[in-house]
């Protein structure tokens, strides 16, 4: 860790608290981070500082957004600041603060930032048991919004498994197209719509299926969520820190598909650089949003807005996200 830069970062935090922060100080600090250090921990500390609303508003009001963002993107890349490090960082910063209020059966179930990260690590352990010596799994999600599907998505993004959320409004032909093109090896299925879609195409696909619920209704090679999640105890060699250090920044991490209303669905690829730089860019574009705000998850997480702005955006800002299951599922 670069002690000189760490002291400068601490000084900026003090300036924020006393409302004495200046844009010139921030520019000097980010330039120093770029020119002086390659230490990941120091750069990550700076990137944590950079999501502060006071910092964002200072840069925004000084009309330095473009210059600032270009430098941030540079630091994100050279320090390998991917989704896993972002989630770990928010867990440390916001700790017991609630990240999700899940409305279920007229009751609100809460998940804290610290608990979310613990659940993601446990889910990562279970996912690691799907690996074989000659095969790295590609994960598909065919489900309505629910906590367990979020855990799968975020664990894949944190530890490097490619993950593909599939639109529930797909036709069976389009579902088959997506499964074949993306080479999904393991499909997590949930809800009535997801079950119906999978059962229609199951005879022509050799894919392992994990059921979020109602596994008896699914055709094919199916295991329950409970069985899958219990497998984490078999992941003796899973090391979250080591796994995160291997995640590449500029390779395809996830694919999101269009609805395919005019032809076959179009797959849009995203790298970790795409995912993380977009969070900082969105933060700079919306300087009034801060950790005291609440989000409502009203779009499906196979939709870019629902997944990136509502889910990942709320986590980036340190907000509270309200969500409830689809009434149809």
Stretches found by the model and what they are:
Residues 95-98, 233-257, 264, 288-294:
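Conserved pre-ATP/AMP-binding loop-to-beta segment of ANL
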Residues 153, 170-200, 276-296:
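Conserved ATP-dependent adenylate/AMP-binding module captured primarily in the ANL superfamily
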Residues 117-125, 235, 249, 268-288, ...:
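Conserved structural elements of the adenylate-forming
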């Amino acid at each position: 860790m670069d002690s000189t830069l760490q002291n400068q970062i601490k000084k900026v935090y003090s300036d924020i608290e006393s409302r004495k922060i200046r844009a010139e100080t921030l520019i000097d600090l980010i330039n120093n981070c770029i020119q002086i250090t390659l230490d990941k921990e120091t750069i990550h500390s700076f990137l944590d500082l950079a999501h502060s609303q006071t910092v964002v508003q200072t840069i925004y009001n000084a009309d330095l957004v473009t210059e600032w963002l270009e430098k941030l993107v540079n630091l994100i890349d050279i320090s390998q600041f991917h989704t896993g490090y972002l989630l770990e960082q928010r867990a440390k910063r916001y700790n017991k603060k609630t990240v999700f209020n899940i409305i279920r059966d007229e009751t609100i179930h809460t998940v804290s930032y610290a608990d979310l990260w613990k659940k993601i690590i446990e889910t990562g352990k279970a996912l690691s048991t799907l690996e074989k010596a000659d095969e790295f799994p590609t994960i598909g999600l065919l489900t309505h919004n629910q906590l367990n599907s979020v855990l799968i998505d975020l664990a894949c993004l944190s530890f490097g498994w490619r993950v593909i959320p599939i639109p529930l409004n797909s036709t069976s032909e389009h579902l088959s197209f997506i499964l074949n093109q993306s080479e999904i090896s393991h499909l997590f299925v949930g809800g009535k719509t997801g079950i119906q879609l999978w059962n229609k195409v199951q005879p022509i696909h050799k894919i392992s299926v994990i059921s979020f619920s109602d596994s008896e209704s699914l055709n094919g090679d199916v295991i329950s969520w409970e069985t899958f999640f219990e497998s984490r105890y078999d992941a003796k060699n899973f090391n979250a820190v080591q796994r995160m250090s291997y995640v590449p920044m500029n390779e395809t991490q996830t694919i999101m598909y269009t609805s395919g209303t005019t032809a076959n669905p179009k797959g849009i690829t995203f790298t970790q650089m795409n995912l993380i730089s977009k969070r900082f860019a969105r933060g700079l574009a919306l300087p009034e949003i801060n950790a005291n705000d609440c989000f409502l998850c009203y779009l499906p997480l196979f939709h870019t807005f629902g997944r990136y702005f509502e889910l990942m955006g709320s986590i980036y800002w340190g907000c509270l996200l309200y969500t409830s299951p689809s009434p149809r599922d």
